Structures are given as C-alpha cells and as structure tokens.
Amino acid sequence: MAEQILVTTTENIPGRKYEIIGEVFGVTTQSKNAIRDFGAGLKSIVGGEIKAYTSMLTESRDQSIARLRQNASEMGANAVVMMRFDSGSIAGDMQSVVAYGTAVKFID
C-alpha cells in the first residue's frame, strides 16, 4: 500500500483537493566500508566519479523515500507534497539521508 503513495516536490497536485495531515519523513544512515574507502582514496588521486559512493547515496535516497511512503501510509495519507532531501555525514564514516514533506489526504 505504501508504494501507492504519490510523492511530489510541488506544493499542489493539479486537479486534486486535499487536507493536510502533517509532517512526514523517512531516514536512513549507511556506513562506508574499507573497500569503498580504498577505491575512494585511489579516485581522489586520479580524479573522477567515485561510483561506490554514488551507488551508496542512490540506495540511501531510495530507502528514505520508501520509508517516507510507509510513514505517510501509516498516517492515512494518499500523497506527500513538498518532498525534499537533506543529507549529512556522521562521525566522518557514515552518511545520513532524510526525505521529508507534508502528508496529505485527498478530499473527494
């Protein structure tokens, strides 16, 4: 059911009226590992994209959106508007990504 929750970065959903339920979020934190760190160290010398980190951040974004949808579903929402991402490092070797927005319920 959570995968059916509409998530949009816009404030309005064209053609839909809704009531605001409240703030909703999904968060994940992942740690780097020795193999990623070794590869990143080599890439920092020669330059270029660090694909292992890009993959980790993409996975983190996907997980945070899935958790946002689950949270919204548990609140009885049909959609999330004004979705945004925020991210940051924790203790230098962990990356946290949060997806947040406003849970809404459609009015017929």
From Swiss-Prot:
UniProt superkingdom: Bacteria
SUPFAM superfamilies, alphabetized: YbjQ-like
Gene3D superfamilies per the UniProt record, alphabetical: Hypothetical protein apc22750. Chain B
Xref: HAMAP family: UPF0145 (MF_00338)
Family: Belongs to the UPF0145 family.
PANTHER family: UPF0145 PROTEIN SCO3412, UPF0145 PROTEIN YBJQ
Name of the protein in its database record: UPF0145 protein LJ_1287
Protein source organism: Lactobacillus johnsonii (strain CNCM I-12250 / La1 / NCC 533)
Taxonomic placement: Bacteria, Bacillati, Bacillota, Bacilli, Lactobacillales
